[in-house]
């Protein structure tokens, strides 16, 4: 029993495989679980168990994803693998599987291909912080110079999208041979695991980040003042803390004079908890759903941003027709809808259901946001798209 308890104290890190179709992402995923379970314990997963990915719904979007888990001596990894290219696009944009780092699989026999580039770009847009490269199928390439050339191409491609191409770990291996148990190739999987352990820093837990609470409801309690409720997204709020009310209106400062949960007064509210926060001197009409309470200076309100968007297909309950420039839907951030206008990239006249597209959005009210914030695009309460803030303009 004590061993089980010990395992749970290991840091949890979320990773995933990305890369071009048929370059060996799923085979590598199977090889990692197999080799690591042999060396460090845990469950091995066969290729076909991973390849028959179950359908999931994230924000109404159908995504096929496989989740596997494995351990190294120092960490516990949750790893996502998607069977199809469209699944990757949806997964990365909706943040259904947030990645602390990604393993980019490139077949040495092909070198970088169109989806290799697209996944790196998406990784940059949606805020995947670290990429490690697994150069696969190296057992099929005898020419050392060719391997060096492919490696150089991959490094250049990463640098093009602002990843540190020159410093990125590249492991040369063969997922298939490792899966078949050949010692020299198994060694490469252990090398990859070591790169994950050392190159991807331990993710900062939500509770250690600056306090943020999306406001869901506002009440006036006679004799006590104004209470806002919501689920603490990150950080800790303590009685007596000064906070800012950010978004929609001018940013205002106030002090939290009480934190309550299930009608009980507490000293603090923590990430993941549903709380009510009593605010000193704030009037009921000065605050509304859609704003956030945040640690002063930790987040700012913005109206204009670049985003990466996936437009739901008709089958997913999305639009049946394309939209054009001048489209004015609602953008749903955290707890509220804000109307916005869009600009499409040069040369793009229309966007079809099922497309993913880069678009510039201009909202009619500012919303508290930072890069990587997810949102939904809605028309009259119906979700027609999902997006992520890639870059703040103003």
Curated annotation (Swiss-Prot):
It catalyses: GTP + H2O = GDP + phosphate + H(+). Residues 136-139 are annotated as: G4. Residues 10-204 form the tr-type G domain. Keywords: Cytoplasm, Elongation factor, GTP-binding, Hydrolase, Magnesium, Metal-binding, Nucleotide-binding, Protein biosynthesis. Residues 60-64 are annotated as: G2. Signal peptide: none annotated. GTP binds at residues 19-26, 81-85, 136-139. Residues 81-84 are annotated as: G3. Mg(2+) binds at residue 26. PROSITE patterns: G_TR_1, G_TR_2. The keyword Disulfide bond does not apply. GO terms for molecular function: GTP binding; GTPase activity; guanosine tetraphosphate binding; translation elongation factor activity. GO terms for cellular component: cytosol. It holds the Pfam family GTP_EFTU_D2. Its EC number is 3.6.5.3. Monomer. This is Elongation factor Tu. The lineage of its organism: Bacteria, Pseudomonadati, Pseudomonadota, Gammaproteobacteria, Pasteurellales. The gene is tuf1.
């Amino acid at each position: 029993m004590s061993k089980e308890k010990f395992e749970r104290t290991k840091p949890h890190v979320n990773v995933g495989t990305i890369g071009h179709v048929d370059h060996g992402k799923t085979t590598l995923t199977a090889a990692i679980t197999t080799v690591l379970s042999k060396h460090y314990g845990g469950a091995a997963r066969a290729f076909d168990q991973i390849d028959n990915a179950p359908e999931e719904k994230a924000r109404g979007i159908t995504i096929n994803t496989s989740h596997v888990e494995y351990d190294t001596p120092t960490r516990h990894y949750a790893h996502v693998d998607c069977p199809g290219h469209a699944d990757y696009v949806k997964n990365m944009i909706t943040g259904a599987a947030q990645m602390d780092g990604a393993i980019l699989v490139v077949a040495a026999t092909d070198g970088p291909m169109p989806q290799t580039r697209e996944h790196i770009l998406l990784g940059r847009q949606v805020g995947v912080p670290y990429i490690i490269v697994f150069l696969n199928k190296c057992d099929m390439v005898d020419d050392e110079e060719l391997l060096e050339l492919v490696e150089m191409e991959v490094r250049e491609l990463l640098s093009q999208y602002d990843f540190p191409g020159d410093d990125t770990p590249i492991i040369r291996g063969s997922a298939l041979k490792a899966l078949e148990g050949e010692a020299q190739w198994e060694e490469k999987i252990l090398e990859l695991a070591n790169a994950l352990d050392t190159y991807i820093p331990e993710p900062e837990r939500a509770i250690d980040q600056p306090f943020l609470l999306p406001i869901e409801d506002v009440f006036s309690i006679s004799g006590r003042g104004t209470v806002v409720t919501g689920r603490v997204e990150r950080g800790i709020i303590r009685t007596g803390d000064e906070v800012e009310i950010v978004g929609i209106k001018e940013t205002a400062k106030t002090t939290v004079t009480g934190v309550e949960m299930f009608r009980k007064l507490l000293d603090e509210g923590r990430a993941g908890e549903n709380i009510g926060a009593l605010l000193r001197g704030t009037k009921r009409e000065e605050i509304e759903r859609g704003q956030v309470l945040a640690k002063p200076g930790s987040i700012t309100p913005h109206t204009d941003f670049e985003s990466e968007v996936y437009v739901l297909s008709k089958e997913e309950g999305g639009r049946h027709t394309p939209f054009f420039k001048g489209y004015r839907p609602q953008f749903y951030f955290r707890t509220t809808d804000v109307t916005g206008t869009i600009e499409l990239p040069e040369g793009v006249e229309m966007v079809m259901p099922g497309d993913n597209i880069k678009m510039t959005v201009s909202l009619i009210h500012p919303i508290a946001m930072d890069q990587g914030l997810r949102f939904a695009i809605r028309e009259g309460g119906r979700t027609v798209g999902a997006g992520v803030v890639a870059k703040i303009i103003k």
